Amino acid sequence: MSRGIIIIGSGFAARQLVKNIRKQDAHVPLTLIAADSMDEYNKPDLSHVISQSQRADDLTRQLAGEFAEQFNLRLFPHTWVADIDADAHVVKSQDKQWQYDKLVLATGAAAFVPPIAGRELMLTLNSQQEYRACETQLRDAQRVLIVGGGLIGSELAMDFCRAGKTVTLMDNAASLLASLMPPEVSSRLQHHLTDMGVHLLLKSQLQKLEKTEAGIRATLVSQHSIEVDAVIAATGLRPETALARRAGVAVNRGVCVDSYLQTSHPDIYAIGDCAEINGQVLPFLQPIQLSAMYLAKNLLGGNAPLKLPAMLVKVKTPELPLHLAGETQRSDLSWQITAESDGMIAKGMSGEGQLRAFVVSEDRMKEAFALLKTLSV
């Protein structure tokens, strides 16, 4: 490969891919292009920065230059890719262009901000860069509204509460983690957050935000309003697909790829939060790690289809941590729940009596790996 491999992006997926490629080939030309600084940080740490009094710069693990030297790369930080000419195998920015043999899109996903009046007052915490932009406001804020009671919203609510802030957590659904599990399973976390002092506004929808002398007024569709100092959008992520569209490759929710992580164009691949693998968007660390292993082989001439085993998803709420696996969101499962003072085991059983999903908490999390082995997938 005389022109080599270009990777657009510098997050976890891009870095895992680089490491896996270099394990197999020390010399193939590798180029990374990204809009950020390309310094490495651990994104899950963003769920705990406030209680741990961390500044954005404290999250940096490795500078971009060190990474480039360690893995023999060409890096182009702070560079916006404007277009991809898939037929000519060329990536273009405003003032540069690069030729490639193979191209990998690792463009990640952007935080979704609800399209309401005053949406510009909402903050997002989806990157080190976003946290850097609002860290002073968040540290100084005493009253915080978090919009979205999913994985990230629940983690942030606990973290801000542990930091001594007055926290309101709002969601359209009737329970927390509603897209991941039924209310009878998430209720343990819900009760714990309430006991900590988090004010839950469930079955509630935000209508508008307005700047006031005292801070920000958040008005609900019900016309109930609350005064806060900061509002965080934790309403999910949207895969970044704009570049893929410009390149002419197939896009659905994410960039559509097959089991080989290949898009509809034979020399363009996608990995990480931007990828939709056989119809599934999997923005979790373990599938990204496995994707990087398989994609590295395939970029270097292999032909190995990605096989994803049953995997754990971790909810990083330190005072009541949860692990879950399987089809926890299925509505036709019968849940067997054992809840004791040291934790909970919830098993989602099919009509045929097969274990199709489970959620474990606290000290019962040590049973997760044994349950994984018996999970029907």
Curated annotation (Swiss-Prot):
The enzyme's main class, written as a single word, is oxidoreductase
Kindly give the InterPro entries that the UniProt entry links to this protein. FAD-bd_OxRdtase, FAD/NAD-bd_sf, FAD/NAD-binding_dom, NO_rdtase_NorW, Rbx-bd
Keywords attached to this Swiss-Prot or TrEMBL record, sorted alphabetically, are: Cytoplasm, FAD, Flavoprotein, NAD, Oxidoreductase
Sorted alphabetically, which SUPFAM superfamilies does this protein's record hold? Answer: FAD/NAD(P)-binding domain
- EC no. given is 1.18.1.-
Q: Where in the cell is it found?
A: Cytoplasm
Its biological purpose: One of at least two accessory proteins for anaerobic nitric oxide (NO) reductase. Reduces the rubredoxin moiety of NO reductase.
Q: Give the protein name, as stated in the record.
A: Nitric oxide reductase FlRd-NAD(+) reductase
